[in-house]
C-alpha cells in the first residue's frame, strides 16, 4: 500500500472511531477476518506507528492491516441526504459558493459511515451491508 493511501486511510478511520466503525483485520493471505467494531486508536512510541485497538482480538493494528466497512453515497436514504444538505447550506451568488458548516457535514458523513473519500473504489475499504450499522 502506498504511503499516501495509508495516511488517507488512517485519517478517515480516526474520524469514524467515535461512531463505532466496523473493520476486518487483514490476514497475511489477504483474506479478511470477521467484521468487528473498532475500539480506539493511538500512537506507540517504540514502534513509531499509529495504531488501532480491536477489542475482540485484543490486538493493535496499523491502518493498512485493517479494512473498514463503509456505505456508498448511493446507500444513503432520502432522509440522510436531506439531513446532509441541511447541514451543508450553500449560498451561490452567480460566481462564488459559500459553504456554511462544512465540518459539521463531514462529521455527519463520518457518523453514518459514508465513503466520501473514494476508499471503496480504490480497494481501501469494503462496502458495508445494510445490517452492519443498524
Q: For the regions a protein language model found, what residue spans apply to each?
A:
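Structural boundary micro-motifs
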Residues: 1-134
